[in-house]
């Protein structure tokens, strides 16, 4: 599997298997197990997904060594506090059945409960301090954030000892977030792309279908290839074996500049939810 190198030198596989909305139990276990057999070596989960136990069991039951799997989870919005985050990290490790995480993220920057008087800033700073300590202790190999816009990153970096290694945001053809992407790339913050198929909104788009036909690939494959050629790390998710396998088949072709330009300008694609206004 091809890799990117994070700012701290840690190698991270260029595509990951996302597990959002994949239910705890048989569905999560079977999906992750199949993904690992298909060739994924990067699994992305989160505390709020509720499937850490099954994800961890699938990893433990695979034929892969722990060091050959890149595992990510995320702190939920009720853990934006130093002590709560510190405890929560250990709880995730226990649920996943592992001794360390490869990547730990703050899931959202501005929980609804912390919006008054910009309390989110102190909340993020406290959680980040706990994450920095976990990083230094070897419990986590890299730390980052998710859904952070530029002003959230600026506030965090102001008090942080370690600049986030990753920012996971919604990126898909037609949802480019160019200013935020430029800000992160200038600071060597790797961009992970969740919902890299625009939560399905690219399907049925005539322009995307034309690009797919020209390249002899599926709509999903050209969207994921677009992410790679932008320098992003896509995190597709599926419970369908055919799609799980197909989403990996993106390393044997290149999109032309013309095709990339077409995908950049796609209209009507799902865009990033405003993290300052989400209802949680």
Regions found by a protein language model. Give the residues of each.
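N-terminal binding-site loop/beta-alpha segment at the start of enzyme catalytic domains
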Residues: 1-69, 198, 262, 278-279
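Acidic (Asp/Glu)-rich catalytic clusters
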Residues: 7, 56-66, 93-98, 157-160, ...
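Short acidic capping loops at alpha-helix termini that bridge into adjacent secondary structure
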Residues: 14, 65-69, 99-103, 141-142, ...
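Active-site mouth loops of central-metabolism enzymes
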Residues: 15-26, 75-82, 115-117
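Short, acidic/polar
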Residues: 23-36, 81-96, 149-154, 175-176
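Beta/alpha (TIM)-barrel catalytic core signal, keyed to glycine-rich beta->alpha loops juxtaposed to Asp/Glu
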Residues: 24, 110-271, 275-280
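A short, structured active-site edge motif that brings together acidic residues
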Residues: 66-79, 100-109, 171
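CE4/NodB-like, metal-dependent polysaccharide N-deacetylase domain
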Residues: 85-106, 133-137
């Amino acid at each position: 599997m091809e890799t990117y190198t994070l700012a701290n030198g840690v190698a991270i596989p260029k595509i990951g298997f996302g597990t959002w909305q994949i239910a705890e139990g048989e569905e999560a276990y079977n999906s992750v197990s199949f993904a690992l057999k298909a060739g994924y070596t990067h699994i992305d989960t989160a505390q709020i997904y509720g499937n850490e136990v099954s994800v961890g069991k699938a990893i433990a039951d695979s034929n892969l060594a722990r060091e050959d799997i890149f595992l990510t989870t995320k702190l939920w919005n009720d853990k934006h506090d130093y002590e709560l985050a510190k405890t929560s990290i250990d709880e995730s490790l226990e649920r996943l059945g592992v001794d360390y995480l490869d990547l730990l993220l703050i899931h959202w920057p501005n929980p609804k409960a912390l919006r008054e008087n910009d309390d989110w800033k102190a909340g993020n700073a406290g959680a980040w301090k706990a994450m920095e300590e976990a990083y230094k202790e070897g419990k986590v190999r890299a730390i980052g954030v998710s859904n952070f816009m530029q002003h959230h990153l600026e506030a965090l970096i102001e008090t942080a000892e370690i600049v986030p290694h990753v920012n996971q945001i919604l990126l898909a053809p037609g949802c480019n977030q160019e200013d935020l992407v430029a800000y992160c790339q200038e600071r060597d913050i790797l961009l992970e792309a969740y919902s890299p198929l625009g939560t399905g909104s690219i399907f049925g788009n005539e322009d995307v279908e034309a690009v797919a036909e020209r390249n002899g690939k599926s709509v999903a494959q050209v969207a994921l290839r677009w992410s790679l050629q932008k320098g992003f790390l896509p995190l597709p998710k599926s419970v369908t074996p055919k799609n799980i396998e197909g989403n990996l088949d993106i390393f044997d072709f290149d999109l032309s500049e013309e095709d990339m330009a077409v995908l950049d300008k796609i209209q009507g694609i799902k865009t990033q939810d405003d993290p300052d206004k989400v209802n949680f």
